[in-house]
Amino acid sequence: MIPRWLLLTLSLLLVWASHPAAAKGNEPNIVTHELDAPPADLFYFHGTNTILYRDRRSLTAHVSFDGGEEWETVKGNDGTIEGTVDLIWRHPFDDNRAYILGENGKHWITTDQAKSWRPFQVDVLPFASMRSFPLEFNGWDPKKVIFMGLDCTILGCLPQTFYTTDDFETVKPLREMTLQCMWAASRPQFALDIDMPKSTGDRILCVVPGLKGPFEHTRTERLIYSDSFFKDDAEGTEAKLDHGKPLSGVSLQIRSVSKYIVARLQSRGTQEQALYVSDDSNVWHRAEFGKHRIEEDAYTILESTNYSIQIDVQTTWQDNRMGSLFSSNSNGTYFTQNIEHTNEDLNGLVDFERVTGIHGITIVNTVKNWEEAKKSDSNKKKLISSISFDDGRTFQPLKADKDELHLHSMTTYAALHEMPLPDHRMFSSPAPGLVMGVGNTGGHLEDYSKGDLYVSDNAGLTWRRALKGPHRYEFGDQGGVITAVLDSSQTDKVQFSIDHGKEWESISLGQKIRPLFLVSTPDSTSLKFLLVGTSSDDTTKTLMFFIDFDGLHERECGSGDLEEWTARLNEKGEPDCLMGQKQFFQRRKANADCFIKKEFAISGPEFQLCKCSAEDFECDYNFVRSEDRKECVPAVPLTPPAGKCKDPSDKYMGPSGWRLIPGNACIREGGEDLEREIERSCSNVTGPPLITDGKPRAGKPQTISAKWTNYFYLERQASNNGVDETIMMLTDKYELHVSRDHGRNWKQIHPDEKFIEMVQHPYFSDTAFFLTDGKRVYYTINHGDSFHFFDAPSVPNKEYIRKLAFHEKFQDSLIWIGHKDCEGKNCRSQAYVTDKRGASWEPMLIGIADGGCNFGYQEGRNNSEKLVICEQYKDEEKNNNRQLVISDDYFSTMEVKFENIARSATKNGFEVVAWYEGDQKEYLNASVSVDGRTYANAHFPFNIKVPQYTVLPSSPHALFLLVMVNGGGERSFGSLVKSNSNGTYFVQSLEGLNVNDRGYTDYDELQGLEGVAIANVVSNREEVLNKGAAKKLRTMITHNDGGQWMLLAPPSKDVDGKNFDCSVTEGKGTEKCALHFHGYTERRDYRDTLYSGSAIGLMLALGNVGEHLTSASEADTYLTRDGGISWTQVKKGQYMWEFGAAGSVIVLVSDRKATKVVHYTLDEGMSWHEFQFAEKELVIDDISTVPSDTSKKFLLWGIDGGKRVIVTLDFSGIWSRDCNDDESDYYNWAPTHPFQEENCIFGHVEEYHRKKPAAECWNAWREPHIHSIGRNCTCTRADFECDYNYEIQTDGSCGLVPGLQPQDHVAQCSQDPDKVEYWEPTGYRRIPQTTCEGGLLLDQDVSKPCPNKEEEYQKKHGISGTGLFFAIVTPIAVAVAVGWYAYTHWDGKFGQIRLGDSGGSQSWLSRDSMLVAVPVALIAGIVAVAQSLPLLVKSLARSSSGLFGRRGMQRPYATRGSFAARRGDYSSVVDDEDELLGADDFDDEEDQA
């Protein structure tokens, strides 16, 4: 018998022997490396122990093939990699590939996990931005890569995109001017479960500038794609984002999310954005978020699944950011809110993570005290943690024993600069069920330093504290080993656990460090770990520790050491179903004394199918969840089957609104089936009117209890969600009203307030402010859907100073100008600023003058976001001069730019200030700035004195000013002057511009048609000046931005087919017979325009045909369909008009005459219809619609018996469909110029999509849609205007102003330091917008080198030895060629270049006159030879560059972005100091275009 004491001893020995492995006396293996700098871009090749990282300091790459124990420097076959490594980029979908991006265009690729590297060349700088990365990968084929780069010169950088389909064996350019590109198949999951053609694998989507180019002030971006790398069509195919139509916006970005592609679009004029989602890149749907708005930088796309997109939508705009978490249905269209008040930081990062490998488990942090945090940023957010086990449908607190646990997440680690490495997580790993985090128990999350390390081995259901204090942690051996290191500035040990974090042992590092990161292989199967930190003794020293737990010598686990673990449990503790299946894992038991030791081999989950339940269904297309989330209700009108619903009481079988979630694996037999059709009532069928009878409808006249009203629309942009058409109205009784349905119903806002003013935000059309008679200001940012208020820092000023000023970029930034010290006599105006929409204010300046203050930010202005420009009285006293002051810090410091100004103004990117020299105030000086800081004096023609001027609407390329010539009240007129591109040199564009006694002028710039303007001039100026005669007005039109003006061509017949009283010259206006219009100075409402921004080419006007403009009572109504070239009379008498549905309908109503009918046209004025809108006649004084003219609804504003009335008109019942985006409903229309052939405008051909007049559908374009920008045209007279000190002569040529000298063009060299040459004045200069090439180059005659640029000039224009033969032969050839050319092409007079086409008139000096032709031919040839020979000797002596340079053949251009004003395309024999036969450097200019 064995003694009992021996049995006890043996039992104790067995217990001791089974203790965790560390007790065996074995230690993990540790190897220490000292690095020059912390590793950058570190990553593991999946399925290996190979690690790659970059040393920022030495520009080297380092690789380890054994998990970090040994390292070597990557040198490449020729050693060129070392010292040139800028970036390391891993392939996200291929375990073998990685890329080293180097300097000078040389890069390397590995396809064998860094064992070897092959160089490739792309001669641009790798480019990363908020839009895209330098490399964009194809998820279907790892060999296909897009390379995003920048091509930089001294003039700046332009994006360049390349692609490869063979691992960079060959690299080809993709397309010019791409802002972002990606493969449609950017993820392996793309088009999952969809049968796609093979060509889809080559499809590339690119965001590119709008066809107007990237540098316009109305810059737009659009999305295009190609399946052939844009080889067949450089323009590609435009993606039809919105109901089968393309869309463009001020900002557009694309990205891939799981199997989806998401396009984010923002329109100009709103911060609201639209998300468009596609799962095949062909069909797109707008994502719907119910009443929530998606705003700029106000949403985050989170880690998503193959059947749903997760998005966090920001709901607060203070520093205390919060949001709401949404999940989409399977096609990404309709989103449902999962949880509110999620925690965000200012960078948009969200406390959100999905547990790795387990479907449906999510951990989020929300704000507990959200109400207090929303009120003030001073109330610190209190965060609490929640977990969902059912894909976000429900959430519950995390529990540690009985206490609630809260964990630090993404925002904390971002603030600590401790974000996880790529492929690594914050909480979880592929180790089944193991989750860890740093946090605390209690009411809410405390500071990170107060947190402890917690662990859960059941996927977050329950937690326990593992270690005290915050730790970095990592998993290994599929959870068999957990390592942790204290996250402090001084720690010298690593702790580890081999029983799921219950027991911990420690290993000494031998020195104290501050850990930077602790990692292992991304699949958590390895026993090798890497710890990187900085030395506590020397922070410049970086240490890397390789830790191998294979040194513990644990045995390999057998089947008895494993357990089956259920991923999710329901409330009953039973395995739960998600997407139709239960999920199970095999994992090591917590107390098993073994390691799995299967590196890179993860046993996947096992699934068990479930019967279908309600959770397996989602809302079908065009259905959305009800508010209680129990039903799917129609999102669009339902259409019953044919023959059904003859009576509202009928019923029919229709769709249930549900469908099985695609990819759901549930068993239908015996389960729920929500897809079955259900019985629906015909009384619930909604939609367009059942009767589409082709007639408009009118509402009953509504009486408003006010004598007068002021109103404006809050316009919806393309990216705005919803369908409301909102009008704000202020009455003479200080009442504020809003209508959200275009005037049918009205609601008074805050009846207890006295509103004195409405102010619409000039840059955001959904925003407006409403001032009371006190400090309170109400506002809306969502088209009047809701109203909020703030208290201004003072009462409004009463000095005609604009009370509010707005920021072009930041909607919440405002300047308020109120009164200060108004209790006594020293009442002054003071400016305040807020960046938080009035939540708090900072005082800026006292003594603000009439011009007020403005934000100086404009798109394209660098470092101008806080620039403010103010007019202020010197020393803050009103009796002193006004000065212009600027500041970049809200006037903590300021700079005085001008000490004695009249006024300042901002227009189209120019800052203009009028100032006096000394004490004289008879004439004004002007200075202009394009950056808001540096002002240059404006130079006016010397024959124009400037007593007063007005800044007019201008193109983005030039500044137009009206300079007063005669200030005699009703007899006032002035000169229209136009600047060069930087606003400093002005030339006279039009003389005698009509001005009224209030300083307004008859000048209209037409929106949509670039360069077209209409103006009225005083034709009898001498009589007005000398005899006091009444003004006689004529109407002029320009089609090239003021370069040329012409009289309007009258129609040949009136509307009744009768002749006019004067003799009409077909297609041309003459001094005796032309068409003249009443202009801007005669309008009651300056918002009324001749044109529509969305109805390209259409205009209406009131006027008469004759020698001059007659009285308004004699005016008739005229219309043009071709941008003002030809006109037709459409109605006798005076009418008011509005355009609707982008020109699909035009409505006319008699102007202030009793009437009860309107007239409308559906075919651009070719035929007209009459509609009676009321039973009795009303006097209508206004007709209105939304400013974009895209609505089918209108409002008539009138008077009935002294009372104000409004009548609504609705034309939506005329047609039932929108136009199809194809040739059946649209045609391509090109604007034309009356002086140019081939439809050339500004040197190129421009085509627009335009609705066919006969198409019975609604034009749904919100703005003119450009079809294409075609080739560049050759230059003609229409591409030039008169140069400085030159003016248009009576015959149309440009002549020197008497007594003046031409401007010395050498000044251009100092304005552009990179300029090599300049041209002597010819009297002409190119219009800034033109892109013409070659042809008639009126601004080029004699070329001169810029000072100190003689050598560069010689290189550009010199002749090389190889060109000797041509140089000798050329003078002789020139003599013959010039003579022959002069004979065959001579078409103008000696000494002048004429107005019109390149040709002149047929006269005795025309080319057909032998009197001219033969002498010219002979003289031209002799002179050419005589001048060439002596110059040839000098040229040969100093030439060193090629005769022909690199010019080559010119190519047509398909995008405006590649257009450039080509100067120097032709050279001539020049003066002695110049080169002979200079060859222009065409290619150099093209590179800079």
Swiss-Prot record:
SMART domains found in the cross-reference section:
VPS10
Location within or outside the cell: Golgi apparatus, trans-Golgi network membrane; Prevacuolar compartment membrane
Topological relation to the membrane, as annotated = Multi-pass membrane protein
Indicate the secretion signal residues: 1-23
What UniProt keywords are attached to this protein's entry?
A: Glycoprotein, Golgi apparatus, Membrane, Protein transport, Receptor, Repeat, Signal, Transmembrane, Transmembrane helix, Transport
The primary location reported for this protein is Golgi
An annotated GO cellular component: cytosol
Domain of life per record:
Eukaryota
Q: Tell me which residues are glycosylated.
A: N306, N331, N684, N862, N925, N982, N1272
Disulphide connectivity of cysteines: none
Q: What is this protein called?
A: Vacuolar protein sorting/targeting protein 10
Q: Which InterPro entries match?
A: Sortilin_C (IPR031777), Sortilin_N (IPR031778), VPS10 (IPR006581), VPS10-sortilin (IPR050310), WD40/YVTN_repeat-like_dom_sf (IPR015943)
Transmembrane stretches, start-end: 1363-1383, 1411-1431
> Which stretches of this protein does UniProt put in the Cytoplasmic compartment?
1384-1410
Question: What GO biological process term is on the record, naming one?
Answer: Golgi to endosome transport
tRNA processing as UniProt keyword: no
Species per Swiss-Prot/TrEMBL record: Penicillium rubens (strain ATCC 28089 / DSM 1075 / NRRL 1951 / Wisconsin 54-1255) (Penicillium chrysogenum)
Cited function:
Functions as a sorting receptor in the Golgi compartment required for the intracellular sorting and delivery of soluble vacuolar proteins, like carboxypeptidase Y (CPY) and proteinase A. Executes multiple rounds of sorting by cycling between the late Golgi and a prevacuolar endosome-like compartment.
Write out the similarity annotation.
Belongs to the VPS10-related sortilin family.
BNR repeat positions in this chain? 63-72, 387-396, 454-464, 495-505, 738-747, 1118-1128, 1160-1169
Q: Which ranges sit in the Lumenal compartment? A: 24-1362, 1432-1489
